[in-house]
Amino acid sequence: MTTSQVLHPRWADTLMYVYEKSPNENNQNKSQIMEGLSGNCPATHCRELISHPALGRHSGTIATHQGSVYSDISSPETGRQCPAPQTSSSASLSYGYPFGNPYYGCRLSHSHNVNLQQKPCSYHPAEKYAETSSALPTEELSSRAKEFAFYPSLASSYQAVPGYLDMSVVPSISVHPEPRHDALIPMEGYQHWALSNGWDGQVYCSKEQTQSSHLWKSPFPDVVPLQPEVSSYRRGRKKRVPYTKIQLKELEKEYAASKFITKDKRRRISATTNLSERQVTIWFQNRRVKEKKFVSKSKTNNHMHT
């Protein structure tokens, strides 16, 4: 038997329950099936179809579209409507799904004789994820039925389990952005690899997007591209300043007296030649290395001649 239930006309969206009953079930369970709409769903195949808000104004076409998929069988309780909550129409829930197919089917297990109030492992009650806002008081939230929109999870904090579709069940009551609660909805025939390139995939974008000035060519031959300015504060090798003849004569005189310089001698030479003590020390070091190379080269030449 297929039963279509449409909510109160003042609700902006349409909630349709389709029940598929096995042939061995009798008609006495019809009343229990209808009670499943208020929260106690019997052990039958239950599919919840939630429409897109943009399709709310075409509620008449939804039933026509579903008629091509599910054949409606007339029954005495077909026209029974869900009890409308005692709330104003301005406090109606709104939800949106901007991606792809606006319907998601949820199938409950037929072999387990449990209702939704017993909280099976794959069931998450609506009260757990209800978020309150300033627009609706707490009494109205508890009195009316909760509606949820299913969104693909953009970021999940748990490992994806094969056989379960990674979805997010979020109430659309709150308008401010809040972290969505993730839920596992069992889906039949679901392949985990089919969504490997879905929302969880990361797109790499290089941050280094530099443009070389020498590669730029102007369409006009007279235009010369601007070259990048060389920084005047670039730290490089200091320009070498040659010593004067008077300074070199004084240094050679002290070196002839002693190849190694003392602290007092370095201060005296620095004051006489107007050089820093560091310059005097470096000059003596270079002078010793130069003499060592000269001696080594002289020995090599003498050895070759002999």
Curated annotation (Swiss-Prot):
Its main location: nucleus. CDD domains: homeodomain. GO terms for molecular function: DNA-binding transcription factor activity, RNA polymerase II-specific; RNA polymerase II cis-regulatory region sequence-specific DNA binding. The keyword Transcription regulation applies. Keywords: Developmental protein, DNA-binding, Homeobox, Nucleus, Transcription, Transcription regulation. Sequence-specific transcription factor which is part of a developmental regulatory system that provides cells with specific positional identities on the anterior-posterior axis. The keyword Cell division does not apply. GO terms for cellular component: nucleus. Belongs to the Abd-B homeobox family. GO terms for biological process: fin regeneration; regulation of transcription by RNA polymerase II. Residues 236-295 bind DNA. The gene is hoxc13a. This is Homeobox protein Hox-C13a. PANTHER family: HOMEOBOX PROTEIN HOX-C13, SEGMENTATION PROTEIN FUSHI TARAZU-LIKE PROTEIN. It is found in: Nucleus.
